[in-house]
């Protein structure tokens, strides 16, 4: 194996990414080297491409970016015992310390010292990526490559949706991006009664309909209260999944929750905004912030969903070769796409 590889690198502190030749990562005794087959583009990668304020203060330059992927193990360190050469794998993109209180209690997703693959250390927009054995996840044979490549965002959706009991509940999802749609699909799969998803982007709303979400609301044209009345809801939503990061959507969600309702919040707002805390208090709402995936309970659940027949393939709207990565980023930046998967 050559000691150089192709990779998408943030080489300059400006808009864009560049295909470069960089050294193949060297592995330590507890590491696994993975040949990447497929990579998917995340919203985080778009922030890095755009070189916005968050990226400017977060990303060291140069940096190989990307964290949504699947591939094949090609080398393991001498202390690795759970994975072998030739194995199909994906990986948890949050590297945790293993030493803090939460890590030692089995709550790795709450680690205060988390490092992000493709953010704080070299990522998976490359021919090879190195991960600690702990972060590598085996992919069953009946899970397609392209689905395994989007397990990172699917995990965000599963973590958010499964934060609260969904059986027989009325669920509102704000934000019909890929994660919001997948969250709505999980809610339906888990036995929610009514699942309503809102957005203002017609392309994403159409995608939600194609993926079987029954009640799709264009918030720029319809009032949520009118939709609730038409579908027979009289007391408000039991569970909210906030995926948009948009102030009007979050405020509308709080207004439409039933007393005692529960809201899981994944959407990241571009700037701070106010909500009516009196409504939160007097309606006795339960608000829970969500970040990443529970390690590794969320991974077990999402593999089970796919093996149980949940078809995520329509959420992938663009399948391209890695040399066409600019087209993939253009699709993501437009807001008029589902997931974009790139083949190495």
From Swiss-Prot:
Keywords: Cytoplasm, Metal-binding, NAD, Oxidoreductase, Zinc
Function: Catalyzes the NAD(+)-dependent oxidation of L-threonine to 2-amino-3-ketobutyrate.
Active site residues of this protein: 44, 47
SMART domains per the UniProt record, alphabetical: PKS_ER (SM00829)
Catalytic function, reaction form: L-threonine + NAD(+) = (2S)-2-amino-3-oxobutanoate + NADH + H(+)
Alphabetized Gene3D superfamilies for the sequence: Medium-chain alcohol dehydrogenases, catalytic domain (3.90.180.10), NAD(P)-binding Rossmann-like Domain (3.40.50.720)
Annotated binding of Zn(2+) 2, by residue: 97, 100, 103, 111
Cofactor(s) listed in the protein's UniProt record: Zn(2+)
Binding site for NAD(+): 179, 199, 204, 266-268, 290-291
Name of the protein described by the UniProt record: L-threonine 3-dehydrogenase
Domain of life: Bacteria
Pathway: Amino-acid degradation; L-threonine degradation via oxydo-reductase pathway; glycine from L-threonine: step 1/2
Lineage: Bacteria, Pseudomonadati, Pseudomonadota, Alphaproteobacteria, Hyphomicrobiales
Localisation: Cytoplasm
Main subcellular location: cytoplasm
SUPFAM superfamilies membership: GroES-like, NAD(P)-binding Rossmann-fold domains
EC number per UniProt: 1.1.1.103
UniProt-annotated binding residues for Zn(2+) 1: 42, 67-68
GO molecular function: L-threonine 3-dehydrogenase activity; zinc ion binding
HAMAP family: Thr_dehydrog
Quaternary structure (record): Homotetramer.
Record's GO cellular component terms: cytoplasm
Family: Belongs to the zinc-containing alcohol dehydrogenase family.
Gene Ontology BP terms: L-threonine catabolic process to glycine
């Amino acid at each position: 194996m050559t000691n150089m590889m192709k990779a998408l690198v943030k080489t300059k502190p400006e808009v864009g990414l560049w295909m470069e030749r960089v050294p193949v990562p060297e592995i330590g005794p507890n590491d696994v080297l993975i040949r990447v087959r497929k990579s998917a583009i995340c919203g985080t990668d778009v922030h890095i491409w755009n070189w916005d304020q968050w990226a400017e203060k977060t990303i060291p330059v140069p940096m190989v970016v990307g964290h949504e992927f699947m591939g094949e193990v090609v080398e393991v360190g001498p202390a690795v015992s759970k994975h072998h050469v030739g194995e199909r794998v994906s990986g948890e993109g949050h590297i945790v310390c293993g030493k803090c209180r939460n890590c030692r209690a089995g709550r790795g997703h709450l680690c205060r010292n988390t490092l992000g693959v493709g953010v704080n250390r070299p990522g998976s927009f490359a021919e090879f990526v190195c991960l600690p054995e702990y972060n590598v996840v085996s992919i069953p044979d009946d899970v397609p490559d392209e689905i395994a490549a989007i397990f990172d965002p699917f995990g965000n959706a599963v973590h958010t949706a499964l934060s609260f009991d969904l059986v027989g509940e009325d669920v509102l999802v704000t934000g019909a991006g890929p994660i919001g749609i997948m969250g709505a699909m999980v809610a339906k799969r888990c036995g929610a009664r009514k699942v309503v998803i809102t957005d203002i982007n017609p392309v994403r709303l159409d995608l939600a309909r194609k993926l079987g979400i029954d009640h799709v609301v264009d918030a720029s044209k319809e009032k949520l209260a009118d939709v609730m009345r038409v579908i027979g809801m009289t007391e408000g939503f039991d569970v909210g999944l906030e995926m948009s990061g948009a102030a009007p959507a979050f405020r509308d969600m709080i207004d439409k929750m039933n007393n005692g309702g529960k809201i899981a919040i994944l959407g990241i707002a571009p700037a701070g905004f106010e909500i009516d805390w009196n409504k939160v208090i007097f309606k006795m709402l339960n608000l829970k912030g969500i970040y990443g995936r529970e390690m590794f309970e969320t991974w077990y659940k999402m593999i089970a969903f796919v093996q149980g027949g949940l078809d995520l393939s329509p959420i992938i709207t663009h399948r391209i070769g890695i040399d066409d990565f600019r087209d993939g980023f253009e699709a993501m930046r437009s807001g008029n796409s589902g997931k974009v998967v790139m083949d190495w």
